[in-house]
Amino acid sequence: MQILNGEKITLGTCYYPEHWDEALWREDLSRMLACGIEVIRIAEFAWNKIEPAEGVYNYDFFDRFLDVAEEAGMKVIMGTPTATPPAWLTEKYPECLNAGIDGTLYRHGLRRHYNYNSPVYRKLCGNIVEHMAGHYGGRSCVIGWQIDNELNCEANEFYSESDTAAFRGYLQKKYGSLEKLNEAWGAVFWNQTYTDWKEVYVPRPTVSGGVNPHQTLDYLRFISESTNEFARMQADIIRKYIKEGDFITTNGLFGHVDYQKMAGESIDFITYDSYPNFAYDLNNYSDKDEMKDRKWSRNLTETRAVSRIFGIMEQQSGAGGWNSRMMQPTPRRGQMTLWTMQSIAHGADFVSYFRWRTCTFGTEIYWHGILDYSGRDNRRLAEVGDIYKKVTALREIAGGEYEAAVGVIKDYDNIFDAEYDKWHE
């Protein structure tokens, strides 16, 4: 299937109507359309706006916004809000929380603090997705759905009690007996033999910090499977309600996920979150001679390997940083154009800039969008308009598929194993 529009390359942006006064909505959409932005992604962090209390659903807020979007002629990608469970949920059901390897729960206050394997959380996620898809799936302006947001970003290891229980079930299904598990894990070494399934856990703190490497590999396979099951659960629900031609995607790429499996079972195509100036992150060492932001071609190549047609859900448009640190500088003049064309050259049919307005509050207060805090026109907005003119001239390549001259085999088992079985950085 084509992404969004098989006749041309499409530009978009990420918009958060819940962050802004409703009086700005029409103005914002009008300004977007004027510079060539035709699609917005919304709602991926807005669980409370739809379900302010358990089982209590209120559609008024996004009904009003979608009315404005339809009136303006703006197309919309709806995000399922499961990346940020509300406070009422985690307070009532702490078993939904993820934990560190020492068992300490990750509490409410940031995002991605849940685990995939809590039966309660899966049920509550299924409920919110069912209600959202059932209510908004038929809207004419809604053209697609994003599952969750950045699955396995921030946290890609899970150590809650729910994960231990699910890990045991995963191993029982895989091996069938403790005898076969012990053999596969070489458990006779250092007297690690298991005699009861209740003795088997996800990795836990040890004297030296190391864990049985065979156990660890199975554990990372289990995380990948758990992530895919979570995505598949949401996709199966959404497909019951979407219109013909609407799509389901999610945004990546992050660790401990077999994206090829996800593309085959859950989503229509993958989208990538592209922040090339992470190459200049002062928190991470990088060699002075490396390719910096130009090495992003490798990431785009991996994205294309997941689905031959793909999109960019978040393309860097400003400086990036949380309230606790700055991670990437503002794009120089022309860099947004360079990165957009780089993505399109690799096969992207859709490029969406993060975000429209820079937020004036919250953890991402320093994560700049197209517009700065003032909301006034600036050079980045003008550059988006220039990009639109360029991509309009490239309309004949929309839907085209990239032909690679060289292929690289990627094996998830080897990647997972190499995280722990390594001798140098």
What are these regions (language model features)?
Residues 102-269, 273-293, 298:
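Polysaccharide-binding and catalytic clefts of secreted carbohydrate-active enzymes
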Residues 1-24, 29-38, 285:
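An acidic-aromatic substrate-binding cleft motif
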Residues 200, 204, 232, 244, ...:
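Carbohydrate-binding surfaces of carbohydrate-active enzymes
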Residues 26-106, 130-133, 234-242:
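Aromatic-lined substrate-binding rim segments of carbohydrate-active enzymes
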Residues 19-34, 125-131, 252-263, 332-341:
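Short, acidic/polar
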Residues 7-11, 36-38, 70-76, 138-143, ...:
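Short, well-ordered coil/turn segments that N-cap beta-strands
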Residues 10-22, 43-62, 107-126, 151-156, ...:
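The substrate-binding groove and active-site-proximal loops of carbohydrate-active enzymes
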Residues 13, 32, 40, 69, ...:
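Conserved, mostly hydrophobic/aromatic
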